[in-house]
């Protein structure tokens, strides 16, 4: 996992743009726990939300992100607003000379994502996307096993991410932006599916090149976005698998991944005690107790590793591993799935 932060004489001044649930439960506490960070400001279109977090963490509250981007005391920002506003705010932050951590999905189109990457390159400031699944200890262990060739060449896979829906944990409940297509752009595929798209790319070490999918609004009466999706994916090497995402997992969560190789298979997050299980063709069984994925139902992750990675990149002047381009490629998979669901055809992923 990530090494502890390098201490610096000058703390990194951070502004959190968007003061909803992800800012409240992930970004704010993780920044506050980092010895190299000073939280300078919180921003929200609903002033009371920003004021509440500002009071808790000794920062200032703003209702307009442009006012925060003008502050010399702000070195970096987290973009935690509804999905449709990720790109314009991130681009503005990068153009203002601020390192930028953007929540996922990073944008609503490949074009927007490329504009964000271009802004990062032009400004010389880092752009990182908040894909935390690849930082989880069980997935790091799985990556080690795969790179060691433990289960041979991957031929198939399946991954799932599901829970009862954002209304159970979002600060806005059932009337929140998650269910409004104009603000959210997508539903479960943006909330959950894109996480697994990034995880699969990273674990397999190759691209998803072709997809077929059903991305549907089946149950949630309060919104007009997808609440269930089933996708078939094909990689550049020819491996095939499935990705499913759902907001109708009542109760609890499913966050498991299975990888099938020529020498055996790996189960991730399928056992309450041993989060990594490896079964080999030889009959050998390997059990790893490396920590489970924490759930929203259980209070969420206390340290996703994302903030630590972002801060370390700034301190060491090292480009983040979960870069804008990494975020774009995960987004491209989701966009291809959306296209396939509409066309009822196999669709290529824009690499």
Description of each model-found segment:
Residues 23, 63, 79, 101-103, ...:
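Hydrophobic residues in well-ordered beta-strands that form the structural core
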Residues 2-57:
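N-terminal Rossmann-like dinucleotide-binding module
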Residues 22, 294-308:
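Active-site loop of classical SDR/Rossmann-like NAD(P)-dependent oxidoreductases
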Residues 1-8, 76-78, 309-351:
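C-terminal helix-rich "cap/oligomerization" subdomain common to oxidoreductases
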Residues 133-223, 344:
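Predominantly a Rossmann-like dinucleotide-binding segment in NAD(P)-dependent oxidoreductases
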Residues 191, 197-274, 304-317:
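Contiguous beta-strand/loop segments that form the cofactor/metal-binding neighborhood of enzyme cores
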Residues 8, 71, 76, 82-134, ...:
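Beta-strand-loop-alpha-helix segment that lines the small-molecule cofactor/substrate pocket
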Residues 58-65:
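Conserved SAM-binding strand-loop segment of SAM-dependent methyltransferases
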């Amino acid at each position: 996992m990530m090494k502890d932060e390098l201490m610096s004489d000058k703390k990194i001044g951070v502004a959190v743009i968007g003061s909803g649930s992800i800012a409240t439960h992930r970004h704010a506490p993780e920044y506050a726990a980092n010895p190299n960070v000073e939280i300078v400001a919180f921003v929200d279109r609903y002033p009371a939300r920003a004021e509440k977090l500002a009071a808790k963490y000794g920062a200032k509250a703003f209702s307009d992100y442009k006012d925060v981007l003008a502050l010399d005391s702000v070195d970096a920002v987290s973009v935690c607003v509804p999905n449709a506003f990720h790109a314009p705010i991130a681009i503005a932050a990068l153009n203002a000379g601020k390192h930028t951590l953007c929540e996922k999905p990073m944008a609503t189109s490949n074009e927007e994502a490329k504009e964000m990457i271009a802004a990062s390159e032009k400004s010389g400031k880092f752009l990182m996307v908040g894909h935390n699944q690849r930082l989880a200890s069980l997935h790091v262990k799985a990556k080690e096993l795969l790179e060691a060739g433990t289960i041979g060449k991957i031929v198939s896979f399946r991954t799932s991410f599901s829970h009862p829906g954002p209304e159970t944990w979002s600060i806005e409940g059932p009337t929140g932006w998650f269910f409004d297509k104009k603000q959210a752009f997508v539903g479960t595929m943006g909330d959950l599916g894109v996480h697994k798209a990034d995880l699969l790319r990273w674990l397999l070490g190759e691209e998803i090149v072709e997809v077929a999918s059903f991305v549907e609004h089946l149950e949630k009466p309060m919104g007009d976005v997808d609440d269930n999706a089933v996708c078939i994916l094909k990689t550049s090497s020819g491996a095939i698998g499935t990705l499913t995402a759902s907001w109708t997992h009542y109760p609890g969560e499913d966050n498991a991944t299975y990888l099938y190789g020529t020498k055996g298979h790996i189960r991730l997050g399928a056992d309450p005690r041993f989060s990594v299980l490896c079964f080999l063709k030889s009959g050998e069984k390997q059990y790893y107790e490396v920590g489970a994925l924490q759930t929203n139902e259980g209070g969420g992750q206390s340290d996703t590793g994302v903030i630590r990675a972002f801060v370390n990149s700034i301190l060491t002047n090292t480009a983040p591993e979960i870069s804008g381009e990494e975020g774009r490629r995960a987004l491209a998979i989701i966009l291809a799935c959306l296209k396939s669901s509409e066309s009822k055809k196999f669709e290529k992923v824009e690499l």
